[in-house]
């Protein structure tokens, strides 16, 4: 089993589109089995990119939640004094208190201070995770975290574990990471055999990609890069290539900016469906990345499609 994580330093770089195209290309291979793990649990959209059909749904629980039993509460106010997050308010009738879930940090101070035992602790559901079939071939595992909830890194681990259960020894798991370099990204990159860094050819894209490179290096992961939205600025294209050369990240390919790519996605297809010269550029890039993955599975130190050692 080979795990490939696709990441970018910022949102909107084209990470999910490239990850979806790669997963479809791998699934189309003879004997190819691919699992797409959408680990952007705060805003998963892999199901849209791959036209997913849900076949399994499971709740995700993370830590305790707290509530106040109105009949047991005497409104003594001790819980309000103990709460440092202003999460406890008077009820609509003013005869008891209630906990505002969106403000509660689940520290348990209210539970410890209530003399009447009116505060109760329960296991709180903060999201769901899913398994789905797709119209393009790869199975999809993804999750949805409730707005304002934490533990996104743990939910990423749940998604990856479920993907691993579906995979076989010869499978490739394509992990679509969240943007940035935060906790869910670290959880997405952990244990990956290869990281594909999607670099948007813009000032913010290059700067944020450099931060991601530093993270990948600190985690001792092998990495290659794909440049996206090239052709808009020769200066930005050159700066992106220079950054990759200075950091020693092999460049697998470049995909120029083209509004037609958006139209392809809106029609329900991946970027592999576009024709013409743009289609050749996309296909060449995806094939180069796929070549690196196959070389790793064969225990080869480098990929002929890139001509550089990882």
Predicted regions and their residues:
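Short beta-strand-centered segment that lines the nucleotide-binding/catalytic pocket of NTP-utilizing
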Residues: 32-47, 123-129
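N-terminal glycine-rich dinucleotide-binding loop that anchors FAD/FMN and/or NAD(P) in oxidoreductases
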Residues: 51-70
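Flexible beta-alpha connector loops of hexameric P-loop NTPases
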Residues: 144-152, 203
């Amino acid at each position: 089993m080979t795990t490939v994580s696709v990441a970018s330093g910022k949102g909107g770089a084209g990470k999910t589109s490239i990850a979806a195209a790669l997963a479809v290309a791998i699934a189309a291979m003879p004997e190819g089995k691919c699992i797409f793990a959408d680990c952007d649990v705060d805003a998963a959209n892999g199901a849209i990119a791959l036209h997913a059909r849900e076949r399994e749904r499971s709740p995700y629980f993370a830590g305790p939640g707290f509530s106040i039993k109105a009949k047991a509460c005497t409104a003594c106010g001790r819980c309000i004094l103990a709460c440092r997050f202003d999460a406890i308010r008077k009820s609509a009738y003013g005869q008891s208190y209630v906990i505002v879930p969106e403000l509660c940090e689940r520290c348990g101070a209210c539970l410890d201070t209530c003399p009447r035992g009116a505060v109760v602790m329960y296991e709180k559901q903060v999201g769901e995770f899913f398994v789905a079939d797709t119209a393009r071939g790869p199975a999809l595992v993804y999750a949805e975290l409730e707005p304002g909830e934490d533990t996104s890194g743990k939910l990423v681990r749940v998604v990856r574990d479920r993907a691993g259960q579906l995979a076989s020894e010869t499978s490739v798991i394509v992990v679509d990471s969240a943007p940035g370099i935060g906790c869910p990204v670290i959880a997405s990159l952990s244990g990956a055999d290869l990281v594909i860094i999607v670099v948007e050819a813009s000032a913010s894209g290059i700067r944020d990609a450099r931060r991601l490179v530093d993270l990948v290096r600190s985690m001792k992961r092998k990495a290659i890069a794909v440049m996206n939205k090239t052709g808009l600025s020769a200066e930005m294209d050159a700066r992106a290539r220079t950054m990759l050369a200075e950091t020693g990240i092999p460049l697998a390919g470049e995909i120029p900016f083209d509004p037609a790519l958006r139209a392809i996605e809106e029609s329900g297809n991946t970027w592999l469906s576009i024709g013409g010269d743009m289609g050749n550029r996309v296909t060449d890039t995806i094939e180069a990345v796929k070549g690196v993955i196959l070389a790793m599975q064969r225990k080869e130190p480098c990929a002929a499609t890139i001509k550089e050692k990882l």
